[in-house]
Amino acid sequence: METTYAHIKSALLLLAVAILTAASARADTYSWTNFQSDIPGVAQHVDPSLVNPWGMAVSPSGTIWVSDNGTGVSTLYHQDGTAVPLVVEIPTAARNRDVGNPTGQVFNETPFFQVTKNGNSAPAFFIFVSEDGSISGWNPTLDQTHAIIAVDNGTNRGVNRAIYKGATLGVANGHNFLYVTNFHTSKVETYDENFHQVNPNGFFDPTLPAGYGPFGIRNFNDEIFVTYAKQDPKREDDVPGPGFGFVNVFDTSGNFLRRLISNGELNAPWGLALVEDGLWVGNFGDGRINNYDPVTGAFIETLMTADGTPLEFEGLWDLLPLGDGVFFTAGSPTKSTAFSASLRKIKIGEHESGSSRIACTAFGIRPNANLRGKCCEVHA
């Protein structure tokens, strides 16, 4: 797990054009525009905090919150790509001597999942999980610019070490629960409304091959979708590779329902989104977005560029459908830089179905192989 970011180089929001080639031979056009960068003159706006943006959540007002894994903060954006003048610092686990490293996050609209500071408690409106084993929550009445630790499993060592990669919320038997992917222990952890861990035997798939850990997680229509990535020898980070991945579906009580997708086009999958009638699965491993039937898991298509090559965003993380758009986040494999992009899709040609449009935002980078582990170059 990489937690040192000595060479933060660039973050960028951009717009371009691509074409999606589907199995039905329909033609879909994508375009995107430069919104944000930490390099002056590259985009419309500059944001030095946008480094390895990972999970996203949206507030009731429509503001997008982004977990910046590389800088240990959450940055906020309007849906037109402009920044909101609030940066929330994500706390670290007690053993973490570096900056925070948030990954997944969720918006909490319940009165539960309270955090406490100076003897005062309030519900965490946003909940963050981090690679250092911490879970934190933010409520502006307690601290406007800092999230507050709710769970610190960063002190766990050995087989019980916690490395959190994703989170989602759900309701089971009338109670609210937080579900967190612990990549190191190969378990999905469940927390009750008071941040107490429960259901230790839930989310078990007896047929899952050894060496895979839960990676991304989403709640779709009261079913918990979990992606799995191949683990490195220390079980800290994913190992990319063609076919390295699975997607399972559980109920909100942690009971296994079905294996949805096995291997195939998966490559360290993390991002999940229901878009139109399909399930978009974003691969961190190769940066591709694949579309599947959300019920059967049947492969439908890979999003393609105009020249017939797969549309790729290096280090692709989250997928967030919002309004008429799907927002993407991505960061470098070295986690030292990132950029964002807005992507708009318009259906064209004789296979056009209605007049629907999808606008998308993507955050991605292409690393310089010679600088791996130090810094990355951005290639538009």
State each model region's role.
Residues 27-350, 370:
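Sequence/structural signature of beta-propeller domains
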Residues 25-28, 360:
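Short, threonine-centered small-residue motifs that mark membrane-proximal processing/anchoring sites
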Residues 360, 375-376:
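Cysteine-centered motifs
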